[in-house]
Structures are given as structure tokens and as C-alpha cells.
Amino acid sequence: MPKRQDIQKILVIGSGPIVIGQAAEFDYAGTQACQALKEEGYEVVLVNSNPATIMTDPTVADRVYIEPLQAEFVARIIRKERPDALLATLGGQTGLNLAVELDRLGVLAEYGVELLGTKLTAIEEAEDRDLFRKLMFKLGHGVPESEIVHTVEEAEQFCAKIGLPIIIRPAYTLGGTGGGIAETMDEFIRIVEGGLKASPATQVLLEKSIAGMKEVEFEVMRDATNQAIIVCAMENFDPVGVHTGDSIVFAPTQTLSDRDYQMMRNVSLDIIRVLGIEGGCNIQFALDPVSFTYYVIEVNPRVSRSSALASKATGYPIAKLAAKIAVGYALSELKNPITETSFASFEPALDYVVAKIPRWPFDKFESADRTLGTQMKATGEVMAMGRTMEEALLKAVRSLEIGQADLHMNRFAEMNEADLHRHIIKATDERLFALYAGIERGHTVEQLHEWTSIDRLFLEKLHHIHRIEQDIVKHGLTPERLRHAKRYGFSDQMLARITQQTETAIRQIRNESGLHPVYKMVDTCAAEFASDTPYYYGTYEVENEAVPTTRPSILVLGSGPIRIGQGVEFDYATVHSIQAIREAGYEAIIVNNNPETVSTDFSISDRLYFEPLTTEDVLEVIRNEQPIGVIVQFGGQTAINLAESLEAEGVKILGTSLEDLDRAEDRKQFEAALTQLDIPQPPGKTAVTVTEATAAASELGYPVLVRPSYVLGGRAMEIVYGEQELEHYMKHAVIASPERPVLVDRYLTGMELEVDAICDGTDVVIPGIMEHIERAGIHSGDSIGVYPPQRVPQAIKELIVDYTTRIAKAFRIKGLLNIQFVFADGELYVLEVNPRASRTVPFISKVTGLPVARLATNVILGDTLASYGLTSGVLPEEKLVSVKVPVFSFAKLKEVDPSLGPEMKSTGEVIGTDRTLEKALYKGLIASGMAIPEHGRVLLTVADQDKQEMLDLAKRFTALGFTLLATAGTASVLEEHGLRVQVVGKLGSEQGSMLEWIEKAEVEYVINTMSRDSQVTKDGFIIRRAAAENNVVCLTSLDTAEALLRVIESLSFEASAIQPFDYMKKAVAR
């Protein structure tokens, strides 16, 4: 079937901000889809709310709207643009839910907009739990015994009938939001209540637990002619019961018999055909390992996280081909872009093993419940490829950047047997390491299988790694054993641990024996067809397929897995850098290990190496490619942290020199440089011991801001109010050393400001100054950022330009730098300087129209800013106001405190742009998922130091018609100032406690600020968690509350009584 000629303009819906369950994979899918549609000559209009993505670049679509993904806003775009068709299946769950809502509201019918690809009936049959179950029965496919319920009472009746454990799956949610496995009645009621609240349809599926069965996923494609293929079959290391996004996954499947595989393949093809899905689809199965019984767990009728993994694992570009199928093409008409000779109707074949390991945020949230279940908790993932399962797994482990070079974790090695047993049987982010510790202690594969239900083959592979390790311990590292260990993925660092040598010593042994990896091509066809797509992975074999070209090349280091503090913003900068390198005539090489991102799309760079971002792995790529230099500025802290070890091995770092990177990162050198420049900075000191830290704090005066050096995202950063707190921080939160001391600064409260700047050694260009709504003390990544600044005097703007220019030149910056300031007590202070791309680069690029990362790359390559018509200073301010609003995933992470502070907690961001600050804020807050009721109840529970400031906010809420709720202490303060308050009970009150109000969602807003009193702090945590779990807006900063008030005031009409006539009084007076 040829492409459709009856449509010209297509609206593509993106997936919005990065949240747990919906990450960068949709930036990759959406970008591919837009490019595919433009290739075919269609006019493409894109709507998405996320400024941090390549997808929202102006070049990706013909017109890009960065607007809230709400029916109200998308309907406006449809009215304005009048598209012929809508493509929603590349926008994740957000895109699907929005398409369903637009259809329900009649918007699509009113404007004659056709839904491309998968039809609404198929979406509803796959997403609606009841319809899906009925379809599976009709087709004769197994589904677990289950029932759809809409109330807790219905749920209790089903539980009484089949008994516990029960799996709870809410309908139309993302990443298992609101779901879980209930082992007890209390758990069951709690999860059902949460699931009903989380589901837009107030519908949950209760099913008899099949936890412990083998979990398998099939990625399937179908076109309108009913051709269908399996792109990739993947097998989870963890049995059913752990969300697939939280599971270690292998591709191709490793433990299935051919009969099992063919059975589920046929079922997958049957399901996609009956549903009539046109494009990509993900089907999840539970398989009984001892019989041929299977159950269909769920069908995702869209491109998903697994699609991105399958695309990168096989090289088959699912999203691109799904977009082409949506406009009428058949699989047999589409060429496979990797081979360019075979067609997309050929099923991919793999001659290597792929391992995916999730990246969890528990290093940021140590209080979080680390148990893994049906509700996803990972923020990102890594992927690795090898010729053996062991190699792929070990490469993936060292890609995680969690301080683990291999499977041996000291904490588990030193643990007592009972505690280790608990860590083995319980699914957590660390169970893989606990299993290895069990093997080190002599537990058999059979024992571990009995305890965990993990397939024996997977456990045998862990056992094999341990046997290789023990062989080296007993017999030494001979050349044969070295080669054997390398073939199974042992890194130099791992071998250094085993042999008690240094990593450098192992590298030297390897270099002397000429032992290096070769690079194999990912070609979708196991070398059946000729392919020259430069997409490689390293392995220890004989033939090297990555033959370097003669053109001069530059290597860019990616930023690794998505995590809090280092998100998709860094991938955005990396992609722009690669594009600039290619445009400058160099060959662009990238090393990265994240399957979700645009940077690991093989069509972006000239050569893609899917490898761990470690010194060893990067050096081997450099040895093979011999680039003229390496760029580390765009890969976040991951890349910056590799600069020193690479330069020590003779690698040329392009851009800002290592010496100058160190001067900015090293506290003493940084302070000395600012003192020499006569630029104010908060008084501060460094400390290596508890004594040094307490002495520094006493001298500076409490409160102090403490943090480790060389970190990103405010990792382990805290505001400390007393000596006891500081001692606890030094003993538990950080490991200080002379090379990496703890920084102790006086804590300044004031307005925080931020700039990104580009320096070529002569000129310093600042695209724009960003102002933070929240005062200093809340991490910049968690603050609402405003451009252009609204409250900053002209004299301070000029001072920011002056300080930035002088710092950039003094630190000999070549490329990008980011500076954070605080304006406190009439003085402008420099808080920190980052000599690299920051997370605000995509935002400032989009709101100013200056491609910051691309321009910085051109400067690194030798261009001057003057050659682009740019001179030193800040660009003229834009007329529209833009706000960057952080997005959090607190509902997914139980036990995490939703209060904001100096350690970053947001997973993503959205943008709001309009003519006034209030309108921009409204769009930004709505886009972030916040509901903004214009009347109702506000619960005020604030710390004593905030009560005076709270009064003004309380008066303004009252003027808008809100009812104020407060506990007795806060209520008395409000009543003293003439405000009417409804008194509510404290936590633990027998009736009418504030917790009841929140749990029943009978308040619209909770304003809660942190107290230093330990009991009050504990109560505050319970209040904030209750708000997060019941979808009640909770604000922990009065600055954010004031911004919200401005928005509500701008939406509200004044309701004033008319004035009495006074001319009669005047006449009488005369």
C-alpha cells in the first residue's frame, strides 16, 4: 500500500515531562516519528510540554508548540492548525489518554481529525481491563482469575472469594501507578484505595497473584495489510511480581524452549491482529516454567519503554517504521534502514546478548522503600551487549555508575547470614548483588532458585562468574585466564580487586600482551545481509568490524542513564554537539549506554559505540578510532569525572582544559580565584573530619549549607542548623577525603539567579538571565525558573554580566559554563561555577532562540563568537515570559519526603510561555500536573519562623473566597489578625484531624513548611506524604505558594459591592 495522499497535515502528541514510568524513550520515539513523517512530505505539527527534549527543537517539526498536554490546550492548537490527522501512539500513556479524551469531548469529530495508527477501539480494548479480559477469553488465551472493581466494597467481595495474595492493576495509568501486590488485608485495602484514586476511569483489575512465574515480553509490529512480525522477544531476570521497568531484562530470550517461544510468538501475532493495532505493540506474558501454561498479563497498544529497548537491542527503528505504517505503508514496502537492502517485514535476528539493568533513585532517597513490586520506581536504565550473558551483564553493571565495578558488594560480603537471606528473598534494587554474595558463601543454584523463583540458568551464570573469579584467586592471572575472564566481561577494575592490584597495573599487563576488544556491528540480521551501519559494541573476539575511516574524528562522551540530577537535558546537549561536529566536517563518534535516548539512535552520529562510560571502555574506543580529541562538557558529571583519567593516558580533552575544570571544581582553588577577582562568595570552608566541620560551622555561624565536592544534582547536600545535625551528616551522609572534602558554607537566604554562558577566550555571550521563584536553599533543579527575570534591578543584571565575563576569562573557559548567584541583603554572591553544560541549556536555548550547545561546540572546535555576529554581554530580553516548572514523581516513591531543599528531587520539567508571568505560571503549573482550583479549602501548617510571612498569603486566600484550615496554634495567630479559620485537629486527634481532611481529599491545597522540632518534623512528613498519595497539592515553600496565589488571582474576577451614593451627603453638608 502506498502512503496516503488524502492527508497533508499531521498533529503529533508528545509525552510531556520525564516521570518515573515515562522517561526519555518517548523523546527518542517522537523525534524518530516526526522525522519519518517529514521525510514523506507531510506537514508536521508537534505539541509537547517538555523543553528538555530534542523532540521540541524547532527543526524536528514544521511547527512546535511547547504547551500543556491538556485537552483544553491541544483543542486550541487543533482549532488553530486544523490538522487532517492525529498521531498519539508515540506519546506514551499521556498521548493515549489525551487522544481518548479529545475523542470523548467531540473535538476530533468537530474538526474532522482522524486518529492515525491504532484506532480508539483497539486502545480501549487493550487499556480497559474489563474489555481486555473479555477479549482474551474470547480468543482462548489464558488470563489470571480476575475481576474489575470500581469500589473498595467490590474489591473486598472478590478478595473473600479467592483469597490473598492479589495483584492490583489500575486502568489507564503509567508504570503501574497505584498498583501493587497485597499479602495482607490492610495492604489490600490501602492499595485498592490508592489504585482507584490513580485510575482516570476509577477502575482497577484485581487478579489472583501469579508472582513467581517467568515473565516474557514480545515487541510486535503490524501494518494495515495484516502483515505482522516479532521485532524482539525479551526475558526478565526477575519473575512476575516485579514491574518490567524495574526488572533486569535479557534479549533474545535465554531460557525458553523452542516450543515455548513459538507458542507465545503465535499468541502475540494473534492478539495484535485481532486488536487491529497498526504500528508497534508490547505484549507481556507470564509463563509457568514447568508446564506450557501461559497467561497474557497486558498489552500496550503503543510505543513503550520496551520498544526503545528493543529498537536499540536489535537496531530495528520501531518508532520510525510505526509512523510510516500509520500513513499507509506496508512492512514489505519499507526498507530496513540498517541494511538498506532487506525489508522491514524480515524479523530481526541477534548474534549477541543484550542486558538491560534499571537505574533507581535510591542513592538520592535513602529513606525510600527499596522493595520492587508492580509499581515502577526506576528513573532510567542502561543497556550492554556482549557475546555471552555474563559479558553483557557485567558490562551493564559497570554502566550503572553506582560505585560497583562488578557483582561483589562489600556490604553484603560483611553481612550476617540472616540479614543476607532477607536481602536475597526480597526483590530490591540490590538483590543481584545479594545473590552474588550468597554464591560467594557457598549457596547452591538450587537453594537460590527455591528462595527467589529466579530461573536456574540466570543463577548458573552468576555462579560461572564466581568460578572464573575463584580460579584467578587460586591460580593467578595468567595470559590464558586474563583472556578467558575478558571474554566473560571482567573489567580491569574487577580484575584489580580480585588480584589486589591497581586498575592501571592490569591495563599495563593487558597492553603488554596485546589484549584488546574488537568491535562488532549491530545489523538486525546476524550478518545474513550486508550492512555498513556504524553501530558497535565491544567484545573479546578476533575480527574487528569497526574499521576507522581516514577522516578526522571527534569523540563525544554521553551522560549515561537518566537519574535525578542528570536527566535528558544532558542528552539534548550531547545531540546538539554531535550535530555541530558533523556540520563542521568532522566525523562524530559517541560513546553512551542509555537505550532510551536520541543520542544512541544510530542515525544521529557517524559512529555509535554502545559501551559503559568507564575509563577502560572509553580508552579502548579511543585506541580503535584515534580521534583528534574528546569533548566532555555535555555528558554531565559522568563525562567530567572521566576527564582526569583520560588525560592521564594521553587523551586530548577539547574545550576547557582539565586544569581549569579542576580550578572550578576544587573548593580551595575556586575560592582563591574569586578572591583574586574581588567577587563576593558566601563565606565557606572545607572539612575532612567531623572536628574540622564543627569548627568551620562555629566560625561561620549556623545555619550552614554542607555538601560533598564533585557532585551533580545536590547529592547529599543539606542545610544544617546545629552541631548534632552536622556530626550526623559527616558520619552518615558522606565519605570525606583530602581529595574530596566536604564544603561548609554560610547559608544565605535570598533571590537565586542563574546564567549559562559561552566563552571563546575573548568574548562571553550570555543568552539570558534566569530568576528562581524560590529563594536560595532549594536546589536550582527543583525551583521554578523565570526568563526574563521579573524582579531583578538593572544594576544587578549588569553586575551578573560583569561577574560572568570576568569568571569565564579567569577560568579560561572554552565552551560552556553555568553560574549560580544569590542576591541577599543588597549584595550579589557567586554560589557556584560549573564549567560544563547544565540542565538549563535546553530551556534557555528554546526561550531565547540561541542554540547554546551547538554554538559552544563550534567554539570548542575553534570558531569565534564574533564570527556568528555575537559580542560580549547578555542578549536582548524576549517579550514573552517563560517559566520552567519542575515535575516530581513522589506518588511512586513511598517514604520519600516531598519537601524541597538543597538536594534535587525532581525527575523532569515543563515549560509555560505567555505574555505575562501569571499566564506563563498557569500554563507551567497545569503542564506539571498540578490542579489549580480557584476556590475551596487551604490547610496551613507552617513552622514558627514562617508564621508572619504566612499571614499575607492567608489574607489573599481569604480575599479569593478560600476557607482557611489550621491547627489551634496557627489558627490563633490568624485569628489575632482578624482572619476566620476552621480549627482542625493535630495528627492523632480522635476526630477531625488534618490527616482525615487530606485523605478524603477535602482540601484543595496544603501549605506546609519544615520545622526543626523533631516531633513536628515527623508530623510534617506524614502530612506531606498523605498529600502526595491523595493527589492534593502540597507546597513546602512560601515562595511557590505566593506564585500559585498570583496565578489564582489572575484567573479570578473581582467581586466588589458597589459604593454607596455620596453626592446626597455632600449636598446635606453644603
Curated annotation (Swiss-Prot):
Family annotation (Pfam families): CPSase_L_D2, CPSase_L_D3, MGS
Sites where the protein binds Mg(2+) 1: 284, 298
EC number: 6.3.4.16, 6.3.5.5
Protein keywords: Amino-acid biosynthesis, Arginine biosynthesis, ATP-binding, Ligase, Magnesium, Manganese, Metal-binding, Nucleotide-binding, Pyrimidine biosynthesis, Repeat
Cross-referenced SMART domains: CPSase_L_D3 (SM01096), MGS (SM00851)
Annotated stretches, region: Oligomerization domain: 402-546
Entry keyword Nucleotide-binding: yes
Top EC category: ligase
Segments for region (Allosteric domain): 930-1070
Annotated positions binding Mg(2+) 2: 298, 300
Positions contributing to Mn(2+) 2 binding: 298, 300
Any one biological process term the GO annotation gives: L-arginine biosynthetic process
Record: residues binding Mn(2+) 1: 284, 298
Family: Belongs to the CarB family.
Full protein name: Carbamoyl phosphate synthase large chain
Organism whose genome encodes this protein: Exiguobacterium sibiricum (strain DSM 17290 / CCUG 55495 / CIP 109462 / JCM 13490 / 255-15)
Lineage: Bacteria, Bacillati, Bacillota, Bacilli, Bacillales
